[in-house]
Design a protein with these regions (language model features):
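A short acidic, amphipathic alpha-helical/loop segment
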Residues: 129-133, 238, 299-302
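C-terminal active-site subregion of NodB/CE4 polysaccharide deacetylases
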Residues: 14-118, 125, 153-174, 244, ...
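Histidine-centered divalent metal-coordination motifs
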Residues: 60, 252, 256
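Long, hydrophobic, well-ordered secondary-structure blocks that form the structural core
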Residues: 119, 123-160
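CE4/NodB-like, metal-dependent polysaccharide N-deacetylase domain
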Residues: 110-111, 123, 132-144, 196-222, ...
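Extended, charge-rich helix/loop segments that form flexible
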Residues: 47-54, 153-245
Length: 389
């Protein structure tokens, strides 16, 4: 179901003030503020101030057809990726292998504005669309691979279901297997949630058959999905080809299901993931990416015991010598990210903005605490935390 604010005459001070202080700003105003900041030299200054920070960029898959119209962060076009890498090279961002970058970061010997490119999940388009571009541009890339769907050759269920509902032409649907009838004009999210839960309990072969039934009910061609091999991860042969081409393949859990507090499940996910990939990859499997960015600081010890040396998040920001190797920040790139926003992240301007916003928030908290403490005798003393950059 394919179910900006213009402001004239804003001064530069007003634009930057809005940008730094407001919790939510319309995208056109943000971009206007970024263009203004660049023209005033703030991008250049930010790059100098943050040059010792490691930039790690996060991509996911490549569109093999028109999936980018559905989720343009999950599936980027090949030309989009090419232009990004060409920008990095043109602007002098050295692109390093993950292992080399982390080793240099640990001893504070990174080249200025060092950059790492990572890709999550192991989507088929990384091999069919991305690899030729990676080879042509001669860049190191790390691909974090989740292995359940490598082993079970069906489309990724959660993403396929979401796509089918996005494509649905019908306004009302009677879902298969007695799940229920829904008015998609008002209940699409509820219907999709029910279907996601239902399919999670099915074995792979039955899950595939249910996807066909669901597509028919929603009046979407499943033949197109199967014919173009949409929403599939790489198979073993493609992963071997990726590894043979020098791509760094690393850990991303087996089922892409990551608990916060179940240590045994964490161990199982890493062990199964590593055991499967060891049949394909000769280099050590010791770097990890948290599925969907779910993690807790307490998991660092768990991962270290499992022989993992680093773990990436989807928290925005740069990485310095004092950044935990188990909470590495990344810049998530994709179709919705404009050129000026990408430049703002890469130069470190947005890093400085986030630091300033944290500082302003801490100041407001301190003032509020001071106000309560000065409200009269007998009031309890409230602790105030300090904000850091």
């Amino acid at each position: 179901m394919k179910h900006g604010i213009a402001q004239d005459g804003l001064t530069s001070t007003t634009c930057i003030g809005l940008f730094l202080a407001a919790p939510s700003i319309p995208v056109p105003i943000v971009r206007a503020g970024l263009y203004l900041a660049r023209s005033l030299g703030f991008f250049w200054l930010a790059r100098r101030l943050t040059r010792r920070g490691l930039r790690i960029i996060c991509y996911h898959g490549f569109a093999v057809a028109e999936e980018y119209k559905y989720r343009s962060t999950l599936f980027v076009r090949g030309e989009f990726f090419r232009k990004r890498v060409e920008y990095l090279k043109r602007k002098g961002y050295p692109i390093l292998a993950l292992q080399d970058a982390l080793a240099a970061l640990a001893v504070d010997r990174l080249p200025p504005c060092a950059t790492v490119i990572t890709m999550d999940d192991g989507w088929r388009g990384v091999y069919t669309v991305g690899l030729p571009i990676i080879r042509e541009l001669n860049i190191p890339v790390t691909v974090y691979v989740t292995t359940y769907y490598v082993e079970n050759r069906i489309p990724v269920y959660t993403v396929t279901v979401s796509y089918l509902f996005w494509r649905a032409a019908a306004q009302r649907v009677d879902l298969p297997r007695g799940i229920g009838a829904f008015d998609l004009r008002h209940e699409a999210e509820i219907a999709e949630e029910v279907v996601q839960k239902f399919g999670a309990e099915l074995p792979p072969a039955e899950r595939l058959e249910f996807l066909r039934e669901l597509a028919k009910a929603l009046d979407v061609s499943f033949d197109e999905i199967e014919g173009e091999q949409l929403f599939r991860v790489m198979d073993e042969q493609q992963l071997r080809g990726l590894a043979a081409a020098g791509i760094d393949i690393q850990l991303h859990s087996h089922r892409h299901n990551w608990p916060l507090y179940d240590q045994k499940m964490v161990e199982s996910e890493i062990d199964e993931n590593r055991r499967f990939l060891q049949r394909i990859v000769s280099r050590p499997l010791q770097h990890f990416c948290y599925p969907s960015g779910v993690y807790g600081p307490h998991q660092a010890e768990w991962l270290a015991r499992l022989g993992v040396k680093s773990a990436t998040t989807i928290d925005p920001g740069l990485n310095y010598i004092d950044t935990s190797p188990f909470a590495l920040r990344r810049l998530v790139d994709g179709g919705p990210v404009s050129d000026i926003e990408f430049a703002a992240e890469m130069t470190g301007f947005m890093e400085l903005v986030r630091s300033l916003r944290r500082w302003l928030s801490a100041r407001r908290t301190q003032r509020a605490g001071a106000g309560m403490n000065s409200s009269g005798p007998g009031q309890p003393s409230l602790p105030c935390g300090k904000g850091g950059a």
